[in-house]
């Protein structure tokens, strides 16, 4: 069976995602579509607006199999996010990765990916990182290509292509040009497509404009968001006040010395927004800070990080997805494709199980990795 993989967050699922999934199926000429989806926390450094099981149900309106991207990938920079996603795709024997980008030229993106692999070995690159320059800024300076590197989906697409060259050279790539709204546009403009940011805002404010930009057949699944990033503040404050500096230093993604800034600024902040504002500097971007704060919230340490894939958590599937899973188990009997988390399989997913427990504290949800059955359609 030939498969196409989509690396996703679906926070929440909308018409742009449906467009991407539909074109990916058509252009890849594959039998099955697989979504590798972030769980209860997403790459922007915040809890997803809906539980991963609800988002799986939404996703199955367009794909055949949904698996969870390991938490370490979700709360990392684009390169680590991409590395873990591509390694997960490889574990699933995916043939083609399809990603959205602002550029229609796969050739240009592949050329930049190859250049970047070389540049990252260069002493100048490491020196610029030490100076506190952001990753996209360094790359645009070194490659002299501002246009392609100004777009977030291009940057992520290049990270996928780099990871494929390094870890899965047999895998093919396909890019679908994004349609409609800009990535971070805050208002729905009544066109068929809108950004995830604008849809989340509409749902939070009880504004019905979101109905114009999500598929009709799954609109009954949408409701007020389960939680927001502001809900994390009391828990983060508790962690920052009670943990010794040495423990904070061991938190995943914390750069040398940032733990001092965290412990200083928490006493000057009365909300997540004010903490973020107090922490921001030229060196530390908002997204970096938010990911650090989520790792503090979840107490994910550097020792918890494993970039190798030893098992895959299956969240949901259609009949076609079920057939593909059967194919995988027959062809890779030593791999672990887990549809039911229990005491025997829980050790593969310690970080994800912890993230679900914390998400439930934030959102008053009750679906855990142990009591929630596989989503089937």
Curated annotation (Swiss-Prot):
Q: Name one GO molecular function term.
A: ATP binding
Nucleotide-binding among the record's keywords? yes
Chain segments annotated as transmembrane: none
| EC number(s) given by UniProt | 6.3.4.-
**Presence of the UniProt keyword ATP-binding in the record:** yes
Residues spanning the signal sequence: none
| Record's catalysed reaction(s) | cytidine(34) in elongator tRNA(Met) + acetate + ATP = N(4)-acetylcytidine(34) in elongator tRNA(Met) + AMP + diphosphate
Compartments reported by the entry: Cytoplasm
UniProt entry keywords in alphabetical sequence: ATP-binding, Cytoplasm, Ligase, Nucleotide-binding, RNA-binding, tRNA processing, tRNA-binding
Which terms does the UniProt entry file under GO BP?
A: tRNA modification
Q: InterPro entries, alphabetically?
A: Rossmann-like_a/b/a_fold (IPR014729), tRNA(Met)_cyd_acetate_ligase (IPR008513)
Q: Which Pfam families match?
A: HIGH_NTase1
List the GO terms this entry assigns under cellular component, sorted alphabetically.
cytoplasm
- The enzyme's main class, written as a single word, is ligase
Q: Which Gene3D superfamilies match?
A: HUPs
Record-listed ATP binding positions? 7-20, 100, 153, 178
Q: Which family does it belong to?
A: Belongs to the TmcAL family.
Function of this protein? Catalyzes the formation of N(4)-acetylcytidine (ac(4)C) at the wobble position of elongator tRNA(Met), using acetate and ATP as substrates. First activates an acetate ion to form acetyladenylate (Ac-AMP) and then transfers the acetyl group to tRNA to form ac(4)C34.
Q: What is this protein called?
A: tRNA(Met) cytidine acetate ligase
Species, as recorded: Staphylococcus epidermidis (strain ATCC 12228 / FDA PCI 1200)
């Amino acid at each position: 069976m030939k498969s196409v993989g989509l690396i996703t967050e679906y926070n929440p699922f909308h018409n742009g995602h449906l467009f991407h999934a539909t074109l990916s199926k058509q252009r890849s000429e594959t039998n099955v579509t697989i979504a590798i989806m972030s769980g209860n926390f997403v790459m922007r450094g915040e809890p997803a607006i809906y539980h991963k099981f609800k988002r799986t149900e939404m996703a199955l309106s367009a794909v055949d199999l949904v698996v969870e991207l390991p938490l370490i990938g979700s709360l990392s920079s684009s390169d680590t996010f991409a590395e873990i996603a591509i390694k997960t795709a490889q574990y699933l024997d995916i043939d083609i990765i399809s990603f959205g980008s602002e550029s229609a030229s796969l050739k240009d993106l592949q050329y930049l990916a190859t250049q970047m692999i070389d540049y990252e070995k260069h002493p100048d690159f490491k020196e610029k990182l030490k100076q506190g320059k952001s990753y996209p800024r360094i790359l645009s300076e070194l490659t002299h290509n501002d246009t392609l590197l100004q777009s977030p989906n291009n940057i992520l697409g290049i990270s996928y292509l780099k990871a494929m060259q390094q870890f899965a050279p047999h895998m093919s790539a396909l890019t679908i040009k994004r349609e409609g709204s800009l990535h971070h546009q805050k208002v729905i403009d009544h066109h068929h497509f809108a950004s995830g940011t604008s849809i989340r805002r509409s749902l939070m404010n009880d504004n019905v404009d979101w109905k114009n930009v999500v598929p009709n057949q799954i609109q009954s699944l949408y409701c007020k968001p389960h939680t927001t990033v502001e809900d994390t503040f009391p828990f983060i404050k508790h962690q920052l006040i009670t943990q010794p500096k040495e423990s904070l230093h061991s938190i995943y993604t914390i750069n040398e010395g940032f733990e001092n800034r965290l412990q200083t600024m928490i006493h000057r902040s009365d909300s997540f927004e004010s903490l973020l504002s107090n922490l921001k500097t030229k060196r530390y971007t908002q997204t970096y800070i938010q990911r650090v704060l989520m790792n503090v919230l979840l107490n994910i340490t550097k020792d918890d990080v494993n970039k190798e894939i030893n098992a895959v958590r299956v969240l949901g599937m259609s009949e076609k997805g079920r057939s593909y899973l059967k194919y995988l188990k027959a062809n890779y009997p030593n791999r672990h494709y887990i549809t039911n988390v229990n005491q025997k399989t829980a050790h593969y997913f310690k970080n994800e199980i912890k993230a679900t427990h914390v998400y439930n504290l934030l959102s008053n949800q009750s679906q855990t990795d142990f009591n929630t059955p596989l989503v089937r359609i």
